[in-house]
Amino acid sequence: MDEDKDIDSKESGEYEDDFEKDLEWLINDKEKSNGSTIEMACKKEDDLDQVLKENETETELGQQLSDPDNSPKDEALPRRNDFISVPSIQPLDPISDSDSENSFQDSKPENQKDLEDEEDEEVRRYIMEKIIEANKLLQTQEPVNDKRERKLKFKDKLVDLEVPPLEDSDTCKALLENETNMSGKLSQLCISGDLEQESVLVSVTDGSCEENDRKILVERDGKFELMNLQDIESQGFLPPISSANSVEHESSQLPLRAPNPSVGGIKKEESEAKGHVLPISPAGEPLAQVPQLLPNPKNRPSSAANPDVTKKARRSNHRIQSAGVSPVTSTYCLSPRQKELQKQLERKREKLKREEEQRKLEEENEKKKENEMVFKAWLQKKREQVIEMRRVQRAKQIEDMSSRQVNRDPQQAFRLWLKKKHEEQMKERKTEELRKQEECLFFLRGTEGRERAFRQWLRRKQIEKIAEQQAVKERARQLRLEARRSKQLQSSLYSIPEAKAFRFTDHYN
């Protein structure tokens, strides 16, 4: 808990430092803006000071040149300021070095004091002017708007969650003491290494008690039962346990007992998962107090570290993955009845699978049959439509032919025939002209041209022959059609019987 408090305090401290840094940044920006104006003012002051110093040095040099007695001062000033190099003028009266040094030292402090006083006055004057200007600016500025939304906002309560310290320190101490007592008593036990079959804790009583009277509390399937030690040993869960005095002598001589074959693997797994035994005295009272959970454990935040969970995770990482997980298909721990049930379930699954496949095949066959029936119906419908269209076209052709025979104009037919003849003659003329042009080119080209012209002539002859045959066929077809039409007309004219033509009918009776 102390570590959690330290972590929370560190996080809150870092959170407060961030806000302090933001405030310092805002303050520094304001100081920089004010400092820039002050730097400009200082630069102006330095420039004025340099100008004043130059003017003073020039006036002093002019006075020294006019007065020959002040020659040592003239030599000292150019060395100190290095503004103007003036040649040294030898005085008329010889003066010793000690006198010149004394006079220079006397004049130096006076000049420095005068310069410092003037600089102080200039600085004061400049500062006063700046103060007056700043006051004027502040008076002219608009008041600050407090309702303006600020970018940097602060919460009333900076820390959202505070973890209270544990108040049950006394209960924790009691739990630790109980654990140490239990570990001390368990260390007195001497049980053989075959403890993986069932997790049983046995309390060793004093040697005065008889072995037959000792009882142990065993948990099975959520129920607690008092059992004798001999019954547990006979079932093979534990090796025989002697008294505390004879354990040290006989522990090396005890043979390891094999588990009872009547106990199946399922019982072992259940005993490993659920078997918890408490040490009981012969009177039936527990020897040691078992640690219990807190009555009202407080809810801790999820960020708090849980050392038990981390330790378990570390331990589990070192184990092999297959050690804790048994294969699903393994049947080594099943009883014969369970194996039979498993086989029945597998048979049911296979049967359902076969039925599902059969049902799918039947559905596919039904769909195929339906598709074939639909296709046949569509094909029959299309055939009927084609037959109907042909019948209608034939009827129209017969009507057109009959109308042409009835309303036939010989002059119009002659004009059509004359037009066709004219078109045929024009085509023949064009072909004749092309042939003549090819023959002219034939005499100019040589042997290659002759062969090509011969091949073209043969092709043209074949085309003409085919055209004549088609014309003969067309003429014969037209003759057959005319003969058929004439027969139809004759049959329609002579179909009325003669008796009906000369019969008298009285329409008034």
Curated annotation (Swiss-Prot):
Residues 22-33, 41-56, 70-82, 266-275, 337-369 have a biased composition (Basic and acidic residues). Residues 335-377, 418-488 form a coiled coil. It comes from the Eukaryota. Residues 1-122, 237-369 are annotated as: Disordered. Transmembrane segments: none annotated. One of its GO terms (molecular function) is microtubule binding. Homodimer. Interacts with HOOK1. Interacts with HOOK2. Interacts with HOOK3. Belongs to the CCDC181 family. Microtubule-binding protein that localizes to the microtubular manchette of elongating spermatids. This is Coiled-coil domain-containing protein 181.
